[in-house]
Amino acid sequence: PGNRVRAVWRARLEEHLGHFQIEPDELSAGHLMEDPLALSGLNAACAMASACLPEREAHPAVAEAFEVLIDALETPELWPALYVRWEAGLLADLGYGLDLRRCAATGQTHDLIYVSPKSGRAVSGGAGAPYKDRMLALPGFMHGAGDLETGDVAAGLKLTAHFIQRRVLWPADKQLPDARARMIERLEAAGAL
C-alpha cells in the first residue's frame, strides 16, 4: 500500500478470472514505512476503502481524495484532519453524505456545533441544546467554520464512524476495520487527537 500503479485488467469475459498488467507510477511506500503514524493512517484508509466500497464499482472522487491523503501522510499535523474529511467524502460518494451546511431545525448557517445522529444534518447550538446528550459533536473544520482545535480530529472520527457503521457497514454485516482502531490508538499516543 502507498505506491501508485497503473493497472490494466484483462479477461476474455467479465466473469473470467483474468489477469492484471501493473506498472509503477509513483513509489512512496518506502517513505511511509519509516513513519509508524503515517503508516497506520495509510493502513486505516486502505482497510476502510476495502470494507466500504463495493467491488467492480468506480469511485473516482474517493480515489482522487485517497491520493491527496497519501501525499499528506508526510505532514503529521495535517493528515489526521484530512483523513476525517476523506471518510466524510467516502460517505458522500456512497450516497450517505452528511449535510453540514445549515441547521436542520432553523436553517441558520452559523453556530453549527452538533450533528443529528439520525439524519446526519447539522444542528445549531441553540436548537440542539435540549438534545445535546444525544447529539454528535461537529468539529468546525468539517464545515469550514474555524481552524483545527484540540479534540476536533477525535470528534470527527467519532462522527464519521457513527454514520459509516450505521449506513454502510452494519447493513452488510461488517464492522469497522481493526486498522482504524489501531490508527486512533497511535494518534492518541502521539497526542494528535
Q: Language-model segments: which ranges?
A:
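Non-catalytic alpha-helical scaffolds and adjoining flexible linkers that form interface surfaces
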Residues: 1-193
